[in-house]
Amino acid sequence: MKTELTLNVLQTMSAQEYEDIRAAGSDERRELTHAVMRELDAPDNWTMNGEYGSEFGGFFPVQVRFTPAHERFHLALCSPGDVSQVWVLVLVNAGGEPFAVVQVQRRFAPEAVSHSLALAASLDAQGYSVSDIIHILMAEGGQA
C-alpha cells in the first residue's frame, strides 16, 4: 500500500526516505515533487518548475525552482537527501553568482518558503538588486 504524501508525511520523512522515493523511479519522484509543489504558493507572474530527471543537476530528490518573468534569478527549494539532511532554499543569480542559501529548515515548512518567495517578489518589484534580496532573505529567513 502506497503512503499518501500529505503535508504531515512530508514533514516527518527522513532524508533517506526522500532518497528511497527518488530511487523507486520517475513516477514516484514526480508524485513526490507534485506533493511538495501543492503546498507552495508561487508569486504572481513567477513560474514554478519541478525537477523530474536531472534538469537542475539531479542532486536532490525534490528540487522546485521559482523564477520571476525576467529570469534574472531563481529561488530553488531543495529537499533533504544524500547532499543535505535539511531543506534549503537557495537563490541563484542567472549568471550563477551570487549564489546563497537563504533559508534552512529542519522540517518542511511551506508557509516559510511561501513567505520568502513573496518577500523576494516584492523586493524585486521594488528594484532591489539580487545581492540585496539575498541579504534581506538571509536576515529574514535564516533557520526555520
UniProtKB/Swiss-Prot annotation:
Record keywords: Plasmid
**Superkingdom of this entry's organism?**
Bacteria
Note one Pfam family from the annotation.
Answer: PsiB
What does the function comment of this entry state? Inhibition of the induction of the SOS pathway.
Q: State the similarity comment.
A: To PsiB protein of plasmid F.
Any idea what this protein is called? Answer: Protein PsiB
Q: What is the lineage of its organism?
A: Bacteria, Pseudomonadati, Pseudomonadota, Gammaproteobacteria, Enterobacterales
